[in-house]
């Protein structure tokens, strides 16, 4: 079976909320390329940063969609007309060049739909999209295209590419299944509407990704099930989130683990305002934050969202575990806010090993409303009553100190000048080794399209507080194919204890 296919053994023992089955392509890029390789240069593409690559990319896809590799060699390409690449099986797009937006239409620059056994990657880890979103944003416009969208794609991976300065969203996965996304850098402007990764899908593993923007970092939307998000670096971003949630919300079995958030809107937010449906079996563990406006922010009356008809979205069986670090101003925006609707209270919520402290002032607040469970301002009960509780802490909890990342940005990227294409990092969370080495780590400069950098990883069933151990076999695309084997284990952080001096006010 293909080496980039993630095999899940001991399935009955897997922790609830993790993946429900295998993820990733079914066949290797090496095998696909032996079937056929469609070099876009042979279909009219020119690496001159001005000739539209759109028609050549579409033609190459038509030739290789039923088995093969569409190869975009190193070089600078322009894209003026967007491409919708539909159908196909056992196919891949190997982006080793850089594609620069020159068109101005809305929509999606690249859309992949109704496809299975698919891989989108750079074998050098240097492939990128430059969206030049600042050309829209500097004029005050929030219009323009998105960069990459996958719709109804199964058994897939996206990795080792950078998505930069999209006029709108950078990357979305809509109604996809059995996917793996990793080793990516996403860099957008400092304004809303420039989402990093949005996913509403089933059985998807997103890991080892850095996002800079001012909106969603990695966000789960409805409907979604069995989404595992790990080793995420929100580096001056909007922060990770769930939502916005509306009518008939259906989200379950979601795990976020090892999330580092710096100078962002929040460390994690669940946002809704009215609506209906359920979010169940949510785990948020091993979070580190510094300088963020909000930390844990569950808000069922989010004022930035128009009110939707319904009693609210019900949250149940939610665990928040092992959060450390500091928030910008704990008296204005305390590190815990769990505000649930009276008609749809939150139940079975647990907050444990949570130690954060304010960077400004000498006190912070914890606010809970109609939220039932164990920890801090949560109330005992089954959700049949209503309440609001505010706790004020005037002493720092023990164990709140947490490491920072060397690559923390000193300032955000603006909206009126070009944003540089970054190098994909090799660290995404303090002390955690990425599950797969960068594809370009063992690739020579004499690059040819021959094989993938994807990796075989076998999950070992583990407690929810631990990250799975992955054994990765990286395959370079040098001809002849060569392999390098690395073993990577993601390390969790130990538990911390906290003591608070609090004043409680219940209404």
UniProtKB/Swiss-Prot annotation:
InterPro entries: Glyco_hydro_28 (IPR000743), Pectin_lyas_fold (IPR012334), Pectin_lyase_fold/virulence (IPR011050), RHGA/B-epi-like_pectate_lyase (IPR024535). GO terms for cellular component: extracellular region. It is found in: Secreted. Glycans are attached at residues 235, 317. Gene3D superfamilies: Single-stranded right-handed beta-helix, Pectin lyase-like. Residues 462-491 have a biased composition (Low complexity). Its main location: secreted. It catalyses: Endohydrolysis of alpha-D-GalA-(1->2)-alpha-L-Rha glycosidic bond in the rhamnogalacturonan I backbone with initial inversion of anomeric configuration releasing oligosaccharides with beta-D-GalA at the reducing end. It is an enzyme of class 3 (hydrolase). Residues 1-21 form the signal peptide. Residues 462-507 are annotated as: Disordered. Keywords: Carbohydrate metabolism, Cell wall biogenesis/degradation, Disulfide bond, Glycoprotein, Glycosidase, Hydrolase, Polysaccharide degradation, Secreted, Signal. Its EC number is 3.2.1.171. The active site is at 215 (proton donor), 290. GO terms for molecular function: polygalacturonase activity; rhamnogalacturonan alpha-L-rhamnopyranosyl-(1->4)-alpha-D-galactopyranosyluronide lyase activity. Residues 492-507 have a biased composition (Basic residues). The keyword Translocase does not apply. GO terms for biological process: cell wall organization; pectin catabolic process. Disulfide bonds join 38-64, 217-234, 340-346, 368-377. Pectinolytic enzymes consist of four classes of enzymes: pectine lyase, polygalacturonase, pectin methylesterase and rhamnogalacturonase. Hydrolyzes alpha-D-galacturonopyranosyl-(1,2)-alpha-L-rhamnopyranosyl linkages in the backbone of the hairy regions of pectins. Active against linseed rhamnogalacturonan. Belongs to the glycosyl hydrolase 28 family. This is Rhamnogalacturonase A. The lineage of its organism: Eukaryota, Fungi, Dikarya, Ascomycota, Pezizomycotina. The gene is rhgA.
């Amino acid at each position: 079976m293909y080496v980039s296919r993630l095999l899940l053994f001991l399935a009955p023992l897997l922790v609830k909320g993790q993946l429900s089955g295998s993820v990733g392509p079914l066949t290797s890029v090496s095998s696909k390329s032996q079937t056929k390789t469609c070099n876009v240069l042979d279909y009219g593409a020119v690496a001159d940063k001005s000739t539209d690559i759109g028609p050549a990319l579409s033609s190459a896809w038509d030739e290789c969609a039923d088995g093969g590799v569409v190869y975009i060699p190193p070089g600078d390409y322009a894209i003026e007309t967007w491409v919708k690449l539909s159908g196909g099986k056992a196919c891949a797009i190997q982006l080793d060049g850089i594609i620069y937006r020159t068109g101005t239409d809305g929509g999606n620059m690249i859309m992949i739909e109704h496809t299975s056994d698919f891989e989108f990657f750079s074998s050098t880890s240097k492939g990128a999209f430059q969206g030049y979103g600042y050309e829209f944003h500097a004029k005050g416009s929030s219009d323009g295209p998105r960069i990459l969208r996958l719709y109804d794609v199964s058994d897939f991976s996206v990795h080792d590419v950078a998505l930069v300065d999209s006029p709108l969203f950078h990357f979305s996965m809509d109604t996809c299944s059995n996917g793996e996304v990793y080793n990516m850098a996403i860099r957008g402007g400092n304004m809303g509407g420039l989402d990093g990764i949005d996913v509403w899908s089933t059985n998807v593993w997103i890991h080892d990704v850095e996002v800079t923007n001012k909106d969603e970092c990695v966000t789960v939307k409805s409907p979604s099930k069995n989404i595992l998000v790990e080793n995420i670096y929100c580096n001056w971003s909007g922060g990770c989130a769930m939502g916005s949630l509306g009518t008939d919300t259906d989200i379950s079995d979601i795990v976020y683990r090892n999330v580092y958030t710096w100078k962002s809107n929040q460390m994690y937010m669940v946002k809704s305002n009215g609506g209906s449906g359920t979010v169940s079996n949510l785990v948020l563990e091993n979070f580190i934050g510094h300088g963020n406006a909000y930390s844990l922010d569950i808000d069922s009356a989010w004022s930035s969202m128009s009110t939707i008809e319904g009693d609210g979205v019900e949250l149940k069986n939610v665990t928040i575990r092992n959060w450390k670090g500091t928030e910008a101003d704990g008296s204005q925006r305390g590190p815990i806010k769990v505000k649930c609707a009276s008609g749809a209270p939150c139940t079975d919520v647990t907050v444990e090993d949570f130690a954060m402290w304010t960077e400004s002032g000498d006190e912070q607040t914890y606010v809970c409303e109609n939220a039932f469970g164990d920890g801090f301002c949560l109330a005992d009960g089954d959700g049949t009553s209503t309440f609001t509780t505010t706790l004020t802490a005037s002493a720092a909890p023990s164990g709140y100190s947490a490491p920072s990342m060397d690559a923390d940005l000193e300032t955000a990227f603006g909206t009126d000048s070009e944003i540089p294409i970054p190098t994909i990092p090799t660290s995404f969370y303090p002390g955690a080794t990425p599950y797969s080495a960068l594809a370009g780590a063992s690739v020579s400069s004499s690059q040819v399209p021959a094989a993938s950098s994807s990796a075989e990883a076998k999950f070992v069933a583990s407690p929810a507080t631990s990250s799975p151990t992955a054994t990765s076999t990286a395959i370079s695309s040098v001809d002849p194919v060569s392999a390098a084997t690395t073993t990577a284990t993601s390390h969790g952080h130990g538990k911390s204890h906290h003591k608070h001096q609090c004043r409680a006010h219940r209404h």
